[in-house]
Amino acid sequence: MALLRGNSLAISQKMLSVFQASALPHISLRIFISPPSIANIWNSILLAVPKKKTSYTKKRSRLLSGKALKDKTVNRCPICGSFKLAHHLCSHCFRNIRREFNE
């Protein structure tokens, strides 16, 4: 096992030397972070923490609010005048049509 690791290390060093010769010149960029910018980042992290625990009532009201059932649009049937859901067949007219086809 150690022999394989040594061979692979030697092979990888040879390949690295070949690729380094043909690669583009190395450019190093040094970026200096000034201490005030670190302080600003640290303050934003500290300020993101809530000061007090959220109460049970507020938590439950937030979780359960806004989930009411949506209102259904109810229209009058243009044929018989009874109430029906929008984009649905009138149940009264449907029963009449069904009765006629069954006879």
Curated annotation (Swiss-Prot):
Q: Which Pfam families is this protein grouped with? A: Ribosomal_L32p
> Where in the cell?
Mitochondrion
Cellular component (GO) terms are: mitochondrial large ribosomal subunit; mitochondrion
| Matches recorded under InterPro entries | Mitoribosomal_protein_bL32, Ribosomal_bL32, Ribosomal_zn-bd
Q: Name one GO molecular function term.
A: metal ion binding
Transit peptide, UniProt annotation: 1-47
What is the protein name stated in its UniProt record?
Answer: Large ribosomal subunit protein bL32m
Q: Which gene encodes it?
A: mrpl32
